[in-house]
């Protein structure tokens, strides 16, 4: 099981839907979050993409030197990037980071934003373009280890003599991750990607998506790994966790929800449609209505696009829910919480010891790394918990 965190390059706050409790997103703050994730033992961080975010490649590059082991899941965007340029970017980043790049293939689902970026393709055409893009990208990188060039002629993209002189550290190329809920997305995942990601839907729905992608891949003689994107709200007691969830949306007003849902409704993203359906397009507001599956809460999606659900509960409960998802075949969990710095620590301290995961040792010196807690009465270190042994 691999646990990832998230860099909030589109903003961070104690509350959703308001500037109250917000904090500036600058390099120093992102370095704090990345450094914490690196030290705490998270496998890597997802860096979001889109016009609401800072550029993910610039952000990721600025954090290479501030981290030692942390991996970076960074987006390539068919239609915005050319595949040969994206291949060079990926190879350079992988080389400079010592093999710490993961690539997130993002097709896009907001027609208005895409047209602003010069992409005038419908849903089906975007997936055709994405399939051509990632095929060219993969071939250029794979052939770079032997110095070969690549030719390709497609409906949307063509290259002649495409060649990369500096190969990536990872062979044949940095792993490709990808998320999408439509049939076209599942077909692309089955044919070309290494890891398929889903947003946090109820386990039964996630199981159906996994089965569909897995079956499609098997027919092509391939296997695909699986991951999930979730928020987490964990506190020492169940009541405290639900209180924190309610507090997170306590500043959200009706006008903000209506405006957000109208924006989501114009998108042609199947994943976004499924997220909105979990709270009936913003109509559901109470805890009972928003708890769509045990401890799975859809309140985040009232105003946040993309991943809109959170696991809410005490450490044992949240760990148990994660293990339930893992039993479906998921082994990659991309998590986040508000604010992202504090919650990175909280989740690692409270939940990591309860998960069936290989601990990531980030600090040299073995026993010097702790955790110990403050020395008692200037005499002894506190007793070590059984879960820490």
From Swiss-Prot:
Record keywords, A-Z: Flavoprotein, FMN, Monooxygenase, Oxidoreductase
Enzyme class, spelled out: oxidoreductase
UniProt-listed InterPro entries: Alkanesulphonate_mOase_FMN-dep (IPR019911), Luciferase-like_dom (IPR011251), Luciferase-like_sf (IPR036661), SsuD_RutA_monooxygenase (IPR050172)
Catalysed reactions, as listed in the record: an alkanesulfonate + FMNH2 + O2 = an aldehyde + FMN + sulfite + H2O + 2 H(+)
GO biological process: alkanesulfonate catabolic process
Matching Pfam families: Bac_luciferase
GO molecular function, one term: alkanesulfonate monooxygenase activity
The EC number(s) this enzyme carries: 1.14.14.5
Classification via PANTHER family: ALKANESULFONATE MONOOXYGENASE (PTHR42847), ALKANESULFONATE MONOOXYGENASE-RELATED (PTHR42847:SF4)
NCBIfam families to which the protein is assigned, alphabetical: alk_sulf_monoox (TIGR03565), PRK00719.1 (NF001939)
Family: Belongs to the SsuD family.
Function: Catalyzes the desulfonation of aliphatic sulfonates.
Protein name: Alkanesulfonate monooxygenase
């Amino acid at each position: 099981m691999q646990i990832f965190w998230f860099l909030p390059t589109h903003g961070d706050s104690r509350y959703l839907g308001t500037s109250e409790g917000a904090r500036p997103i600058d390099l120093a703050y992102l370095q704090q979050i990345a450094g914490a994730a690196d030290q705490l033992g998270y496998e890597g961080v997802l860096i979001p993409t889109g016009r609401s975010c800072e550029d993910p490649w610039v952000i990721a590059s600025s954090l290479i030197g501030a981290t030692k082991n942390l991996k970076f899941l960074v987006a390539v965007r068919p239609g915005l990037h050319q595949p040969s340029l994206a291949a060079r970017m990926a190879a350079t980043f992988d080389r400079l980071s010592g093999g710490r790049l993961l690539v997130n293939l993002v097709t896009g689902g907001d027609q208005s934003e895409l047209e602003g970026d010069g992409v005038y393709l419908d849903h089906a055409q975007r997936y055709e373009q994405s399939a051509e893009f990632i095929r060219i990208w993969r071939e250029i990188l794979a052939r770079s280890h032997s110095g070969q060039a690549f030719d390709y002629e497609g409906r949307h993209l063509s290259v002649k003599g495409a060649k990369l002189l500096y190969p990536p550290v990872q062979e044949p190329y940095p792993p490709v991750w990808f998320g999408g809920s439509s049939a076209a997305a599942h077909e692309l995942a089955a044919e070309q990607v290494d890891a398929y990601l889903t947003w946090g839907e109820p386990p039964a729905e996630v199981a159906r998506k996994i089965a569909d992608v897995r079956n499609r891949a098997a027919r092509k003689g391939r296997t695909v790994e699986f991951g999930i994107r979730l928020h987490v709200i964990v506190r020492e007691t169940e009541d405290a966790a639900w209180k924190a969830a309610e507090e997170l949306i306590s500043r959200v007003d009706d006008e903000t929800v209506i405006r957000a849902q109208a924006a989501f409704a114009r998108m042609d993203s199947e994943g976004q449609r499924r997220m909105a359906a979990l709270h009936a397009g913003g109509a559901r507001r109470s805890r009972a209505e928003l708890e769509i599956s045990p401890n799975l809460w859809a309140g985040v999606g009232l105003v946040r696009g993309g991943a809109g659900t959170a696991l809410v509960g005490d450490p044992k409960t949240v760990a148990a829910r994660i293990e339930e998802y893992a039993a479906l075949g998921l082994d990659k969990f991309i998590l986040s919480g508000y604010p992202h710095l504090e919650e990175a620590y909280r989740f690692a301290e409270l939940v990591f010891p309860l998960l069936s995961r290989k601990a990531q040792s980030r600090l040299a010196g073995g026993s010097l790394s702790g955790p110990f807690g403050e020395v008692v009465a200037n005499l002894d270190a506190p007793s070590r918990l059984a879960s820490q042994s």
